[in-house]
Design a protein with these regions (language model features):
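Oxidative protein folding and maturation machinery
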Residues: 1-48, 52-53, 59
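Conserved Rossmann-like nucleotide-binding pocket used by diverse enzymes
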Residues: 36-39, 62-67, 96, 121
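A generic structural motif
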Residues: 53-54, 159
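Short pre-active-site segment immediately N-terminal to redox-active cysteine/selenocysteine motifs
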Residues: 57-62, 66-70, 139
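Conserved redox-active cysteine motifs that mediate thiol-disulfide chemistry
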Residues: 66-83
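Conserved segment of the thioredoxin-like fold in thiol-based oxidoreductases
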Residues: 86-128, 133, 137-140
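Thiol/disulfide oxidoreductase modules built on the thioredoxin-like
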Residues: 116, 123-169
Length: 172
């Protein structure tokens, strides 16, 4: 906070403006706001938008699992997400995965190995940049939970938090 005020007092307007811009971007992804749109591609190469996918799942609680083939924690979490996915009626809850892989073949191989039963997408190069810029994350796994109205509920830090938040939302 001191650095923030120092920028103002010392007249470092360029740094202050960059800081303010980052705050505005981060605010877009806060609880209660719609999901920030990202450019994606399906396994068959079709380009699509995250906002359209979220809209298609309105009426359900949606878990968006951002992951990568090279992320050990992501891959180890998949069985726990499968268990959660299998335990809740599809009319109430859905999961989609969005890969942050830049290597298409690694993404495809990981999908085959992990046998995730839900729909898969991969960030395009533009989507990749937008993901890290707007969601202000430094890595994956990154979970985003969306309510049936298409608004962000939160971004739980792990599968245990995902499960607790999903159950709480379904009780609502």
């Amino acid at each position: 906070m001191f650095r923030f005020f120092s920028m103002l007092v010392l007249g470092d307007t360029a740094r202050f403006n960059r800081f303010a811009e980052r705050l505005q971007l981060a605010e877009q992804t806060t609880v209660g706001n719609p999901v920030v749109d990202l450019d994606l591609v399906t396994p068959d190469g079709t380009r699509c938008q995250l906002a359209d996918i979220v809209k298609a799942h309105e009426g359900k609680t949606l878990l968006i699992d951002f992951w990568a083939s090279w992320c050990g924690i992501c891959r180890m979490s998949t069985p726990d997400i499968k268990t959660l996915y299998d335990s809740i009626d599809r009319s109430q809850f859905e999961v989609i995965s969005v890969s942050c892989d830049e290597d298409d073949s690694a993404w495809r191989e990981a999908m085959k190995e992990d046998k995730m039963p839900w729909t898969q997408y991969c960030l395009t190069p533009e989507g990749y940049k937008a993901f890290f810029l707007h969601y202000q994350t430094i890595g994956v796994p990154y979970y985003l939970l969306v309510n049936p109205e298409g608004k962000v509920i939160g971004n739980p830090g792990g599968v245990e938090q995902v499960e607790a938040m999903v159950k709480k939302e379904l009780e609502r």
